[in-house]
């Protein structure tokens, strides 16, 4: 495994930068499941199987995130931030300004099988397709994951043939949108109606039909008769019966509402919902032949979230993305890389530069001079143009090694940061920068 977890960054120094904003593509948090599993078919010569039922049509669902001061275009089939139909950028910030900071983006992933054969799924401008809508098939009981209980590093998700039929690709070619405020209001209304709460119930209104439709239509479960994982989108199971039923108070799962803190991030790897507004969808790399990269499929199921917050600070100019990557096949993926591909264009694309802040794990794009001119129909940002950054807040967990890997930590006695030696960090899979990982030198083993 290659990625290390990345901490939230504070952004570039924007002091004295008049009329500037700093927009950041964030979230890019990734949870991996099952990539270290050696399946029963993971043997020499086992990497050339022809996918069954892999004849899906390209995904067509689209949406525009515009909950805060960013307008960001997302497609179900893995591409993002680009209007492919018009060949124009589609990450507008500030919203409504007709100024764009990103031309295109996508998720990239790849690795090798036991024979050293490359498995690859990626997009640039989506001239072809490497991703299709929907969850992949599994053999129930091959894993030990149960979302009712905290999940550690040893958990394994169900795996199997990792296939999908065209009608299921079509059925999941959509986004599921929910807002945290809607879930909070539903909780309060339910508890008042059920007699669980009595105070403050006099003025409680029932959720609208639209809100109830989103909550009752939440894709909490896959179709096990089609070989899908029973547990799909995150949901809060109020009565802990393992089944999603809003009549019993179940709802899409934000774990930080109403004083709850259901998931301790340092030790619990369950994925909940994030943001004030959340768009959830599921896609895969097995629905058909890879025509963008021509790479061999992995058998990866990707559960994605695009989310944002409405605030009065810089976060109002940011968007966030979370990917839960689940290897549904029986083959282990080695030497694995994941990346967020971005083609950033700060207004006029002809005068931009890219850079990397190593200590923060931050990649950024900025204008080459102090004025971003308009050119050839592309609007420039003018004087004091902005920069835009891309950061992994949380990357994949490191492979378990039985160590609390070394990293910077705050000495409780001296109140000073203690930085490990570079040689110690290298030899023990640690880090030397405080901004590029979590779980290091925290007295907990294998949570890095």
Model-predicted regions and their roles:
Residues 37-448:
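A long-range scaffold signal marking pre-active-site subdomains of enzyme folds
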Residues 1-41:
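Bacterial Sec-dependent N-terminal signal peptides
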């Amino acid at each position: 495994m290659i990625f290390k977890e990345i901490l939230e960054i504070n952004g570039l120094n924007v002091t004295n930068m008049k009329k500037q904003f700093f927009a950041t593509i964030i979230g890019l948090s990734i949870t991996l499941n099952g990539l270290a599993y050696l399946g029963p078919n993971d043997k020499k010569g086992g990497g050339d199987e022809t996918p069954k039922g892999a004849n899906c049509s390209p995904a067509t669902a689209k949406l525009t995130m515009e909950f805060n001061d960013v307008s960001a275009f997302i497609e179900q089939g893995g591409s993002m931030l680009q209007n492919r139909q018009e060949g124009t950028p589609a990450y507008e910030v500030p919203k409504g300004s007709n100024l764009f900071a990103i031309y295109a983006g996508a998720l990239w992933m790849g690795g090798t099988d036991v024979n050293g054969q490359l498995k690859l799924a990626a997009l640039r401008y989506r001239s072809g397709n490497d991703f299709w809508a929907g969850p992949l098939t599994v053999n129930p009981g091959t894993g030990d994951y149960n979302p009712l209980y905290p999940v550690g590093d040893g958990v394994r998700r169900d795996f199997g043939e990792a296939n999908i039929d065209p009608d299921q690709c079509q059925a999941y070619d959509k986004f599921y949108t929910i807002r945290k405020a809607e879930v909070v209001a539903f909780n309060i209304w339910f508890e008042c109606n059920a007699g669980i709460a009595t105070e403050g119930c006099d003025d409680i209104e029932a959720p609208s039909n639209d809100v109830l439709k989103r909550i009752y239509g939440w894709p909490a479960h896959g179709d096990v008769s089609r070989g899908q994982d029973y547990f799909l989108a995150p949901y809060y199971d109020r009565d802990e019966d393992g089944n999603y039923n809003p009549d019993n108070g179940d709802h899409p799962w934000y774990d930080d509402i109403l004083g709850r803190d259901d998931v301790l991030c340092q030790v619990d790897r369950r994925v909940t919902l994030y943001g004030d507004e959340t768009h959830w969808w599921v896609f895969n790399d097995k629905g058909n032949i890879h025509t963008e990269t021509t790479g061999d499929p992995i058998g990866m199921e990707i559960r994605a979230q695009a989310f944002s917050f409405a605030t009065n600070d810089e976060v109002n100019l940011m968007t966030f993305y979370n990917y839960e990557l689940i290897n549904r096949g029986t083959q282990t993926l080695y030497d694995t890389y994941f990346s967020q591909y971005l083609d950033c264009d700060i207004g006029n694309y002809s005068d931009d530069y890219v850079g990397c802040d190593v200590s923060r794990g931050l990649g950024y794009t900025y204008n080459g001079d102090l004025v971003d001119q308009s050119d050839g129909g592309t609007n420039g940002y003018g004087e004091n143009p902005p920069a835009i950054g891309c950061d992994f807040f949380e990357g994949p967990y490191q492979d378990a090694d039985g160590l609390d890997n070394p990293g910077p930590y705050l000495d409780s006695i001296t109140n000073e940061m203690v930085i490990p030696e570079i040689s110690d960090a290298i030899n023990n899979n640690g880090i030397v920068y405080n901004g590029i990982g979590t779980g290091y030198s925290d007295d907990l083993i294998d949570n890095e």
